[in-house]
Amino acid sequence: TMARTLTSFGVKLTAIEFDKRTIVEIVDNLVHMIEIDFDRRYDLMSDFGSSVITDQDGILTTCFAEHSFLLSLLKAKDQGKRFKVFVPETRPYLQGARLTAPSLVELGIETALVTDGMAGHLMANKIVNRYMTAADAVAMDGSIANKIGTLTNAVCALHFQIPYHAFAVSPD
């Protein structure tokens, strides 16, 4: 992602002589421009994310679903929507238990930590009606790759006709 971002900003620092101060200034300015661009993208994605969340939703996620997902939930909460997020523990590193669930609790969002194998049960019993994740990689055709368990949950969502929204900054 960083290489792609730097390329998109047209950064080529090869074979040009710079003094140390100039390089620091260039890098500082570049980082600032990238931060502004990412903030804009996250804000736009979270506008979409909050718009698809409806009152009383049960939302399933996987792993740590990016800033745009958290912003989506925060915006939906600020709009007065009530919902609950079901967070699988995400083994083997427990990103759901260690990152996502505590972040949601800190934001004051109703959260339930569940085992990785519960997604199908939650969908079949209409406890969850929306699936939202990040995407670790996005192909040019729009297909995504994400953490282990995402495919199984996506297949369950398709079977139970539950919308699946994957958040990503851009194709890889």
Show which residues each predicted segment covers.
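Conserved phosphate- and dinucleotide-binding cores of soluble alpha/beta proteins
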Residues: 90-172
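N-terminal active-site beta-alpha-beta segment that forms phosphate/nucleotide-binding
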Residues: 1-113
